[in-house]
Structure formats: structure tokens, C-alpha cells
Amino acid sequence: MPSQEIFKTKQRKSTNRRRKKRRTAESESDSDSSSSSAASDIEMTNEEEKNDNNSPIISDVELSDLENESEKRDVYELDKETKNKLANIPLTRTEFTSRKDKSVPINLNAVQNKLEMSEEQLKDRIATDQSKEQDAYLNLMFENFGDELNAFRTASDFNSKTVNILANVLKDGTALFDNETLKSIVKSQI
């Protein structure tokens, strides 16, 4: 019961405050006397100070948000000359970007399939390039260390397992280098 009474009294106080604020606002607008004009002058200066204080305050905006907005604007503000230059670059043209009928929507499944196929082709091309470089490296190793390998073959403990182990060691030797280093090693010996 006491909590309900407290709640009611708080409600009354808040309504009284609202009424008082309204009354003071009405009385300020109704009175035009000299004493009220001095008070209104003080209020005007206070309001001007508040406005002055508000103007230099900048809201909390992250720089990344502003950069993203400017990037979005830059993307959409390409002129015709830039578009023509980009159209002449082969990597920026696809059958989807150079289609004539823009009213027909792009089939996203076809785009995804095309991307997957091109990704597989790229992986295959990289794998074949790497295997060619590895083969060239192995040939280089055999040229430089062929006599030692022949000495291994004539040894009494040499068998078929030894050939597999030796071949795997030589293949794994190519993994010591990254692609660029392996290319430079192979090219320097040619």
C-alpha cells in the first residue's frame, strides 16, 4: 500500500511540474514590462551562448564511417571517359558486364558456376606450373648430383624402397623454396 501512495505522489509532482513550466512559459510571453525585458535579455544572451557552445561540438562519428561514405560516392561518380577506359581493359570485362539487354536480371547461379570453373582452372594452371618447376629443379639436381646418385644405385643395400625414399626426398626438397625462389633457381641454371 505505501508503494502505491508514493507512486501517486510522484505522479502528482510530475504533473505539477509540467503545469508550472507551462505557466512560466505563458507568463513570459504575456509580460512585456521593462523588468521582464531585462530578464528576457539575460535569457537571450544565455541562448546565444548555448548556440555558440553547440556549434563547435561535433557528434561522435568514426572516421571509418566517413571514409566508407566517400568511397561509396567515388564508386558511383565514374564519368563516361573512365568507363570507356575500363571497358578496354580485358580483366574488367565479362559477359555479365558487357551484356546488351540490361532489363533481364543476371542469373547469379550462372555467375557463381562460372566463378567456380575459373577458380578450378586457375588452381590447375598453378599446379601444372609448380609441377613443371619441380621437374626442372629435379633435372637440375640430377645434372649436378648424378654421379652421387649412381654411386647409391651401385651400393649393396640399394633396393626398390630406397628409390622411393630418394625420390620423395628430392621432391620434398622443392618444398624448401617458395614459388618465386624455385623459379629463380631454375632460371639461373638454364
From Swiss-Prot:
InterPro entries: Ribosome_Assembly_3, Rsa3_C. Residues 1-72 are annotated as: Disordered. Residues 32-41 have a biased composition (Low complexity). The keyword Ribonucleoprotein applies. GO terms for biological process: ribosomal large subunit assembly. GO terms for cellular component: nucleolus; preribosome, large subunit precursor. It comes from the Eukaryota. Residues 9-23 have a biased composition (Basic residues). Pfam families: Rsa3. It is found in: Nucleus, Nucleolus. Keywords: Nucleus, Ribonucleoprotein, Ribosome biogenesis. Belongs to the RSA3 family. Required for efficient biogenesis of the 60S ribosomal subunit. Associates with nucleolar pre-ribosomal particles. This is Ribosome assembly protein 3. It comes from Candida glabrata (strain ATCC 2001 / BCRC 20586 / JCM 3761 / NBRC 0622 / NRRL Y-65 / CBS 138) (Yeast).
